[in-house]
Swiss-Prot record:
Keywords: ATP-binding, Cell membrane, Membrane, Nucleotide-binding, Transmembrane, Transmembrane helix, Transport. Belongs to the ADP/ATP translocase tlc family. This is ADP,ATP carrier protein 2. The keyword Nucleus does not apply. GO terms for cellular component: plasma membrane. Pfam families: TLC. It is found in: Cell membrane.
Length: 540
């Protein structure tokens, strides 16, 4: 037990604040996060390569998939998860869902992709194309290549179901509140490192497939089979690590380790949810609080802006890479860079910036970064549209390659600041609120507003595509929407910063007053104890 009370050295306390007795819990949890993140990153690059390259719609299919594919898919899988959770044990639910995902990816690579031409709805697509306007070709491609669309949806659901729901459900259940403050920062670092690992492995497999599969129908199929084999192997490790953690989640083992008296993160959430039914409406509370509305605007703005930028960037990349193998290699390198920048920013910049210059400066980093990198990206696109060869000629590359490269830089930094500055300042913004506002407001914002932002961006694109027929033709309208969203984001953060400062100062004054009262009570109690210990003086 001495190790538990012994303080860490300054170096270890900063980089690895884990006690030796916690290794049996932390190490499998860390590697579980790592391998779940590896599969997430591999699937992210693979789904884009499969769906975007080779079709006549390119990146225009993304907005339609987000609304008509991912949203219904998320609802269906969430219903399945809820149904299973009510009838089966936690372990059965985890293994069944993860096994279901792995089984689908293996089935797709070995059976569905090779016979895809026979499965695709070419006649229906031709009929839809004759009915819909030119801007609806993204919807037509989504329906025509339904098997690719299904792979895209399942890959996206790995993030929301396996990573967000299953993994963090395990982490919250097994981790105490005291441990979470030390565990979760390192786990997030593990997720960033998994992006680096997955990006480099995917890049290498694209250039040098490890196994030459005789059943491969084309070069991309061979790469897909190798990546799928890695996904299945990582899935096997995930299931093995979960079984180790499942034994630790048993209440008797937690008692033996002295953790029974301490509330876990999952138990804490359960305690908070007991009062949740008393709230008439999450959104009524949200609408009554200008402060919570400000946080909602910030979350909505980020999800809207990142989606608008991403579709334009991927549209540029699709024009350069006609091969799925080449496109996958490019996206793999972007994944690697995102992981590196996220890890370095999280370790060396985000926390120090907020501690030194305050919440407002930290919260302004995401919109300003996206504004600056986005201006460079869109400026290059407008230069290409105007046949300007200035920067491309100086750098010795074509203007189209330059725009794609700048779009990649914009995406890397946008994703990196999301995992560091944005998430941290968003969570900090809830701290000075009352418990009801904090719990109910956070549930509404994280559970609904973030999804509204993503779907809202897709709906904006669908409307623009119907009107202007293509992403390139919609660029002026997209620029206006982006400027309005970024301007609103920055304005709201400036206002929120003043409110946050006022609320935290008021909270600090309350805490100081309470501490003063407690100190006075302790001093009075000490004085009474001292007087009671004095022996009476008697005289003869």
């Amino acid at each position: 037990m001495s190790s538990e009370v012994k303080s860490f050295s300054k170096f270890r306390g900063y980089f690895f604040p884990i006690y030796r007795s916690e290794f049996s819990k932390f190490i499998p949890l860390f590697f579980l996060a790592f391998f779940v993140g590896v599969n997430y990153a591999l699937l992210k690059t693979t789904k884009d390569s499969l769906v975007l390259v080779g079709s006549r719609a390119g990146a225009e299919v993304i907005p339609f998939l987000k609304v008509w594919g991912i949203v219904p898919g998320a609802v269906i899988v969430t219903m399945i998860y809820g149904w299973m959770s009510r009838r089966y044990s936690r372990g059965t639910v985890f293994i069944s869902l993860v096994g279901g995902f792995l089984g689908f990816f293996a089935l797709f690579a070995t059976v569905i992709y090779p016979i895809g031409d026979a499965l695709h709805l070419n006649k229906l697509a031709a009929k839809l194309q004759s009915i819909l306007p030119p801007g609806g070709r993204g919807f037509v491609v989504m329906v025509q290549y339904w098997s690719y669309s299904l792979y895209y949806v399942m890959s996206e659901l790995w993030s929301s179901i396996v990573l967000s729901t299953l993994f963090w459900g395990v982490a919250n259940h097994i981790t105490s509140v005291r441990e979470a403050g030390r565990f979760y920062a390192l786990i997030n670092t593990g997720l960033n490192l998994s992006s680096v690992f997955a990006g480099e492995v995917s890049l290498w497999l694209g250039r040098n497939p490890v196994i030459a599969f005789p059943m491969a129908v084309d070069p991309w199929h061979e790469v897909l089979l190798n990546i799928t084999l890695l996904i299945v192997l990582a899935g096997g490790v995930i299931l093995y690590l979960y079984q180790k953690l499942d034994r630790l989640m048993d209440e008797t083992s937690m008692l033996k380790e002295g953790l029974a008296a301490e509330m876990s993160v999952a138990q804490l959430k359960k305690e908070k949810k007991r009062s949740k039914a008393k709230a008439k409406s999450l959104f009524a509370l949200l609408l009554r609080s200008r402060y919570l509305l400000g946080i909602a605007v910030v979350v909505l703005s980020y999800n809207l802006v990142i989606h608008l930028f991403e579709v334009v960037w991927k549209d540029q990349v699709c024009r350069i890479y006609a091969s799925r193998v080449e496109f996958n290699s490019y996206m793999s390198r972007i994944t690697t860079l995102t992981g590196i920048v996220s890890a370095l920013t999280g370790i060396f910049a985000a926390g120090q910036t907020i501690r030194r210059w305050g919440w407002t400066i930290g919260a302004l980093v995401p919109p300003l970064t996206m504004l600056i990198t986005g201006a460079l990206f869109f400026g290059a696109i407008y230069a290409v549209k105007g046949d300007a060869m200035i920067f491309g000629g100086i750098l010795g590359i074509s203007p189209l390659v330059l725009t794609a490269w700048l779009g990649g830089v914009q995406n890397v930094f946008s994703r990196a600041i999301k995992f560091t500055y944005f998430d941290q300042t968003k969570e900090m913004a809830f701290i000075p609120l009352e418990d009801d506002e904090k719990n109910y407001g956070k549930a509404a914002i994280d559970g609904v507003i973030s999804r509204v932002g993503k779907s809202g961006g897709s709906l904006v694109y669908q409307g623009l595509l119907i009107i202007f027929s293509s992403v390139a033709a919609s660029l002026n309208a997209i620029t206006i929407v982006l400027l309005l969203a970024l301007g609103s984001w920055i304005f709201v953060i400036a206002w929120l910063g003043r409110e946050y400062t006022a609320k935290t100062e008021a909270l600090f004054r309350v805490n100081v007053s309470e501490e003063d009262v407690l100190q006075e009570e302790r001093e009075a109690s000490s004085l009474v104890d001292a007087e009671s210990r004095e022996e009476p003086v008697t005289t003869l």
